[in-house]
Amino acid sequence: MKFLKIFVSLIFVLVLAGCGRVQPIMDVENTPVAYDLQKKQVKMAIIDSAVSRGWVVKKAESNEVELEFMARTHKATIRVPYSEKFFSILYVSSENLKADAKGNIHRNYNRWVNNLNVDIQKKISVIANSN
């Protein structure tokens, strides 16, 4: 009886541990640029923040930056459309991140996107305060 309780408890713990690996894909949409900046300054904040976090700039156009992040065998690609008033971080594709048709992905992707978002906002603030 005691063995059965331990076995059931162990299975329960393993099931709970596995539940948190995938989460809904986090898109950051229309984040306001709270300062009066030019579009090129917002672009610079996005690129500088991305590079400092290990993202690689794949394309940098006048209204959008495409970024790629690789960690071991995992790869994520995002688009960052921007203007002088707003920016967004949008999922494009991934490899080995457990992405599924329901819009779920490994939680590390959301952590990477959140860190990038926070860094972009900090960099925008630094640029605005240096003017």
Task: Give a label for each model feature.
Residues 20-131:
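Ser/Thr-rich, low-complexity intrinsically disordered terminal regions
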